[in-house]
Curated annotation (Swiss-Prot):
It catalyses: GTP = 3',5'-cyclic GMP + diphosphate. Its EC number is 4.6.1.2. This is Receptor-type guanylate cyclase gcy-14. Changing residue 273 to Q: No effect on chemotaxis to alkaline pH. No effect on chemotaxis toward Na+. Normal cilium localization. The chain crosses the membrane at residues 474-494. The gene is gcy-14. It is an enzyme of class 4 (lyase). Residues 1-14 form the signal peptide. Pfam families: ANF_receptor, Guanylate_cyc, PK_Tyr_Ser-Thr. Homodimer.
Amino acid sequence: MCLFLLLFPYLASGQFLQTVKVGLLFSKDTASVMRAVGYRTSAAAVLVARDRIRAEHLLDQYDFNFTVKFDECTEGLAGGKTVELINHDNVDVIIGPTCNRAGIAVASLAAYYNVPVFQWGLTTAADIGNVSRYPTTVTLSLDTHSMALGVREVLRRFEWDEFVFIYSNDGDEEKCASMKDDLEKMGIENSDVTLAYMVQIQTVTLDALQKALTEVSKRGRIIIACFANGRGFKKAFVASTVLAGMSTDEYMYMFAEPQSRGFYVDEINGGEHYSWDDTDGNFVTGLTPEQIRDAYGKVLYICDNMGLPTTITPEFANFSSQLISRMTEQPFNCVQDCSNSTYKVPATYAGQLFDAFYAYGVALNRSLTQDPTRANLKNGSFVLSDIGMSFQGVGGGTVTLDDTGTRIVQVYMFALNTSLLPYLAASLVINGSEVEYTPFYKSEADLWSVRPLARPICGFSGLECPPDFVKEYLVYTIIAAVIVVLALLAGCAGLLYTMQMKRKEMERQDLLWQVPFIELQQVQSKSKAEASMHSFASGPSTSTKITVESRSETINFIFYYYQQDILAAMKHDLILQFDAEQKAEFRQMRNFDNDNLNKFIGLCLDGPQLFSLWRFCSRGSLSDVISKSSMQMDSFFMFSLIRDISNGLLFIHNSFLKCHGHLTSRCCLIDDRWQIKISGYGLKSVRTFENPKKEDLLWTPPENLRNENEERLPEGDIYSFGIICSEILTRSSAFDLENRKEKPDVIIYQVKKGGHNPMRPSLDTGETVEINPALLHLIRDCWTERPSERPSIEQVRGHLNGMRDGRKSNLMDHVFNMLETYASTLEEEVSDRTKELVEEKKKSDVLLYRMLPKMVADKLKLGQTVEPETFEQVTIFFSDVVQFTTLAGKCTPLQVVTLLNDLYTIFDGIIEQNDVYKVETIGDGYLCVSGLPHRNGNEHIRHIARMSLGFLSSLEFFRVQHLPSERINLRIGINCGSVVAGVVGLTMPRYCLFGDAVNTASRMESNGKPGKIHVTAEANQMLTQVVGGFRTESRGEVIIKGKGVMETYWLLGEQSRISVSAQAPREKTPEPPRRQSVRSISPIIEKMSEETQKGLYSAYKDFNNGNECVS
């Protein structure tokens, strides 16, 4: 029956399988290692691993034959059993042994025989992992060399540059000795960590432990300890720290060893408990578990995954159940010997045995794939030539071997949390000499309250610190303390003073931007009378400046004088209370100083409404200049305006304001030097409550049109900047509103709508100005739909600087050069125009001199006032056409004008022959004077007399064109006397005569006879006695209205000339008047007065002084 079972695999497959002989070395009855690697609780792991190998079809053509030997962890026995397995049993591979000394012996023999060996369990000596000495040995255990590297990384991580080591070989002669060797080697090979002191305890007792702790307290504060497992040594050590008074925050203890359960202790029945609850051992400390647990709070454990709390996964549970049950199978046949309940729990490192055998199966599969000959099964060098692998193990998570067969191990650092419960603090992956540290704690506060120092500040003896300065220099200390207190008081006083002064300074600065309304004086616009007072020499102005006096208030602004400066006060229809943050904003705004920012003066809070005050710019806004200025803009002029706006925006974007938020061309003001100054910035708290006009939204970016509550950003200013640039280049308003059919509402809706081709202004600049295409591209980038795609103001400035073409002149210089060029080109045209002007001026002067006396006209042209002038002796001449009303009734109006023009042309020719000034003609009335404005002595009477005689003689030959049969006759009156002459009126100014002599001359004409020259007694005396040469005849006494009875005369002619009227007209000799009373003669005088007043000449009486003013 047994033979059949042995032959069944071969019969089932139809062919005989090759056999791999496997030698197994175990420790069967050694009590110290039974729980970890005991034969009865671990050997069956090779059968479970064989099943996995078959399931993965790694060695389908091979079967395994197992030979079991027991070395009991002794090197002599292990060496002998190894020789038997190799020479007698002819095995292909040896799995084991499980202890250090036995493992070194087997590894040496395997290297000699070139047999592959896979060790596991407690083989932790670093020498076993030396590939150069033992090239055919693979160890799956965590060695002490790797553990030493992990300790060094932890020490470096917490800046501990020195440590001490306490260990004992009591109960385990191999583990701690190997750990000591590797720590010593690590301290020698690395300068960053030093092993300062080392103590070995021969027999572990409480006294020995306390003595050792007292000794090391003089050499170190970071203490690494190593003791045998399962005998209560570690708990006794921790308890000894309490008894020795060394469980304080000044110390840190570390257990760094392989095959450690950390803060857990295994129980025989498979369970576990905390180390401070361990009852194993004969140590009576007198301490409670709570005291010992508190001391464990100063302990760190560095060990493999055995330190983790036991977790039973389904895979491990299946492995554990098979491990115990299959010990009864071949080749172990452990039935009675394994029936004790002690052997019902798998050994601690049984999983490593599974991993070791499975790793061999993978390595053999690879070697047989390369060379399937039978001879290579036992060739250790060939089997391990491709040993590098990684797989999921049963005993320790992922198993990774490098190309030399050295396992890349992962160890863990465990600590107690604030609740004094174990937790995983960090992970350390050790690959050769490299260590990767991964912390799982949030901060070091999870590990300790204060990190311990490797060396106390005052040294281990406490004598390295300098002596207490206070005790040594008590007097000086007291003096220094007093000085410090006084200094602190002075500092506090200074701080309070500084704060007080700062508060006062803030209040002072607040007074600067809070302008009282009483200190503002409104600019008064000029009255109409003042506006009309222009001299004859003044001409129209061509300046582009805005005279603030021309208008004192607009819809949005009122202009005020403040401290001899003109301010523009922006109106805000609201009343607000400002908090400290807003006041700080106003203070900072008032301190702004930039060439392209309009100065913010402050706010007026106590006026009829809220005013924000800004400096007045004489040329108005950019919008005004574009819409009203006739000044020609070339490309450099436009570029300079755009550059000024970008400079102002750069300052705003880099200030605390971050953005303007409401930038329009109306905010861009222009000063005397044609420099743009941005106004209206800041005042966010004020603008929040204002409703902008539709026209002001034409510059608003689409994102703010869609959401009015969205915060204004610098990208929005860039959009507004692009709209303003389009206004400058096209020399039109935003979106060319005046020449569009759409209203602002429609345009704003289209901009808000957006889309693939959003609404934007035209950039058609015409052919008169050459614009850089790069500038047009920049403007289009500025108003792109997505804010994130718009350039920043720094980028805009960079692009503009690249377009300067090397020109560095400013705009004012450019304007001067442009005006100079313009002046030179117009020089010839001005010269021609000047010649024409001189000719026209001559014509104007001739006309003016005919209307006014030359002397008077010259004064008026110079803008001088013509003062009234008194002339003591002049001769006044009045004439009137007899029965002109009857004659005019026979003519049309045009014929009347023709008649008078023909007549006056003859008269004007006669006047030019004499020193006579023609004052005025009214209808058919004629007024002349001689002796003014140029005085001519007594010759004035001669010139008037000759002119009068000439008038009468010229009528003999004068004929009316349309009435040839009609004859014209004149009545002439002459008087001599004093008059006052002057210019009266602004519109159509006239040179007028004032005086009684004027009225008397008028009465002479009105009381005269047709064809006669009627003169007064004064004129007669001048004619006959003063100048002589004229013949006159007395008319007698005549009643003159306003004069009473006057004696008058007829001028008959000049003695040297033929008399115009040789004889006086015959009149009936009046009867002597009868005596009548004054009362009875009055009606007669009134009737005579009415008859003598007939005529078309009108005289105007001045009721204030009784003089006649003829105009």
